């Protein structure tokens, strides 16, 4: 009988080893290996957070040029105090990575047409759309302009170094839970990723989606005259901002038309056309601002309000922070993925 028990125990052990090393299919993706995910040393248990997390202490980071301090208030908003701007942006990148690393990588993978690398075939249609939209090409060109300015380049380089400093200090058990769920690891951050994120925000804030492409197809179908009747450039009741007859010293920029206009929207290969489903931004997105004269306020001082029309996300699109250096003292909302304060005050 003891041989039966021994054999049974061996079979159960082998079965357990096999089960803990398989990846279960979920849609077109797979779960992480169960043994790794359930491991007390490296799995999701390590991502549990204590209610009494202590942010005190000192960290030595080789990328800093001088001494810097970060204080967290009772809402865990970080207040960065640095001897120079580069160190402040370095710490901003470090903090963004510490609290929002997966969000940063996920959003830039979407913009760069690499979502399927994280979630499998389910992201392929979105990847095709953003690649044919030319998001990476646009980000590369924007980055050239940004890095031509030494001040901007210094800020981006410092920010990127800060993000990578955090990633370099991550141990396997400290990788954010979302990466573990997708059986992925964080990639090194680059200035191009920051440019990609900013381009993605520009795309999201246009609120127009594929209107240009849809209108072009409609005009081709109905003809120019009928299209102008249905979709005039402006309503008759509106006066143009520029008076009729205004002339300009330089001609307007006329974009070059592709040899095959349809190739912008359709993936043409071997004489066949396959429509790419558009990824439509929210048409309610956008931003504006408003001001109140000092004569209408209790304090007698004017009020200027930035009013972004953006949805609620979890985690939030924004990350609140104060940046204080000898050349600036700003407080406000930042984008995880890019340096500086986007909306704030001095």
Residue ranges of model-derived segments:
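Substrate-recognition/specificity elements adjacent to catalytic centers across diverse enzyme folds
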Residues: 2-303, 308-315, 327-328, 332-334, ...
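Carboxylate-rich, divalent-cation-coordinating active-site regions
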Residues: 320
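Core nucleotidyl-transferase/polymerase catalytic module
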Residues: 324
């Amino acid at each position: 009988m003891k041989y039966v028990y021994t054999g049974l125990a061996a079979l159960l052990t082998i079965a357990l080893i096999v089960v803990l090393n398989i990846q279960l299919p979920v849609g077109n993706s797979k779960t992480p290996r169960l043994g790794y995910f359930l491991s007390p040393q490296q799995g999701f248990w390590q991502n549990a957070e204590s209610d009494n997390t202590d942010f005190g202490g000192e960290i030595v980071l080789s990328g800093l040029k001088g001494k810097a301090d970060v204080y967290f208030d009772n809402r865990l908003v970080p207040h960065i105090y640095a001897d120079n701007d580069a160190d402040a942006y370095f710490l901003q990148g470090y903090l963004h990575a510490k609290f929002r690393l997966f969000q940063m990588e996920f959003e830039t993978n979407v913009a760069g047409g690499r979502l399927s690398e994280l979630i499998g075939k389910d992201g392929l249609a979105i990847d095709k759309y953003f690649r044919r939209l030319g998001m990476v090409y646009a980000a590369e060109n924007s980055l050239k302009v940004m890095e031509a300015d030494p001040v901007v380049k210094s800020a981006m380089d410092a920010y990127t170094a800060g993000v990578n400093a955090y990633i370099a200090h991550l141990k396997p058990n400290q990788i954010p839970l979302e990466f573990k769920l997708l059986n992925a690891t964080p990639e090194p951050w680059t200035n191009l990723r920051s440019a990609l994120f900013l381009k993605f925000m520009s795309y999201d804030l246009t609120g127009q989606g594929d209107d240009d492409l849809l209108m072009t197809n409609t005009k081709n179908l109905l003809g120019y005259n009928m299209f102008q009747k249905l979709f005039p450039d402006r309503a008759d009741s509106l006066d143009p901002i520029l008076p009729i007859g205004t002339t300009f010293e330089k001609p307007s920029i006329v974009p070059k038309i592709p040899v095959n206009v349809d190739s912008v929207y359709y993936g043409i290969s071997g004489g066949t056309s396959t429509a790419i489903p558009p990824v439509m931004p929210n048409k309610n997105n956008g931003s504006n601002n408003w001001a109140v004269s000092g004569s209408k306020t209790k304090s007698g001082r004017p009020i200027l309000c930035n009013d972004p029309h953006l949805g609620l996300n979890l985690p939030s699109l924004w990350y609140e922070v104060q940046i204080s250096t000898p050349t600036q003292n700003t407080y406000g909302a930042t984008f995880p993925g890019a340096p500086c304060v986007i909306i704030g005050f001095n």
